[in-house]
UniProtKB/Swiss-Prot annotation:
HAMAP family: PGT_MtgA. The keyword Transferase applies. Belongs to the glycosyltransferase 51 family. Its main location: membrane. One of its GO terms (molecular function) is peptidoglycan glycosyltransferase activity. It comes from the Bacteria. Pathway: Cell wall biogenesis; peptidoglycan biosynthesis. Disulfide bonds: none annotated. This is Biosynthetic peptidoglycan transglycosylase.
Length: 245
């Protein structure tokens, strides 16, 4: 009897309790990640981002080239970027950018149908703000989980920043080729001029590149690029630029 009473009982934890515990840890980590994103975006109201997730990934790979290379990137203020380029990007990437809330529901639904038909993710229906969310924080991976996070960050950007600031950060961080980021670096890389001097045709050709900048960098002067640039050039006059608030 004494031996029995001296034995310590082993407490078992029910599977339900483990599930609740694991769920709490996951939820806490998820909320902490969202808070990190939100704080970063709030800081960018008055501080320019030093780099993006895409830039850091490229910098890692470029450092392993032989000889090692570096990311080309130079921040320039919004008013030092050609209005031609601004109009070309809006005409090409997001015609309702100045007035939308960061989402294009019709484009998202069309992308969903296309992806379902192909059996894989081939389109995203992303607005300029969604592209910026991906460039700043996420990866090039195509998945519905990443898309969901992109939509949340898009809401944060649209809530905290005005449209002109969103566009300024986008213009300075979008990729235009392997290791080439932002309007200033692109203008100097492709045309050897500052972004402030980009003409309408040069801007239209740069806008064409954005869906596949590395492919177009390797296939400069393709017939498709010229044809698509002509279409964008015709639409540029109707492109509405955002106004600062």
């Amino acid at each position: 009897m004494a031996a029995v009473s001296g034995m310590r009982r082993t407490r078992t934890v029910s599977p339900t309790r483990w599930i609740v515990y694991a769920g709490s840890v996951f939820a806490g980590a998820w909320l902490a990640t969202q808070l990190f994103y939100l704080v970063q975006i709030a800081l960018w109201s008055f501080i320019n981002p030093g780099s993006t997730a895409f830039m850091r990934t490229d910098a890692w790979w470029l450092s392993r080239d032989k000889p090692p290379a570096q990311v080309q990137h130079q921040w320039v203020p919004y008013d030092q970027i050609s209005r031609n380029l601004k109009r070309a990007l809006i005409a090409s990437e997001d015609s309702t950018f100045a007035t939308n809330n960061g989402y294009d529901v019709d484009a998202i639904l069309q992308a969903w149908e296309k992806n379902k038909a192909r059996g894989r993710i081939v389109a995203g229906g992303s607005t300029i703000t969604q592209q910026l969310a991906r460039n700043l924080f996420l990866s090039r991976e195509k998945s519905y989980i990443r898309k969901g996070q992109e939509l949340i960050i898009t809401w944060m950007l649209e809530t905290v920043l005005d449209k002109e600031r969103i566009f300024e950060i986008y213009l300075n961080s979008v990729e235009w080729g392997r290791g080439v980021y932002g309007a200033e670096a692109a203008a100097r890389y492709y045309y050897r001029i500052p972004a402030s001097r980009l003409g309408a045709w040069q801007s239209a050709r740069l806008a064409v590149m954005l869906p596949k900048p590395r492919w177009f960098d390797a296939h400069r002067g393709s017939a498709y690029q010229a044809q698509r640039a002509a279409v964008i050039a015709r639409r540029m006059g109707a492109a509405e630029l955002p106004q600062s608030q």
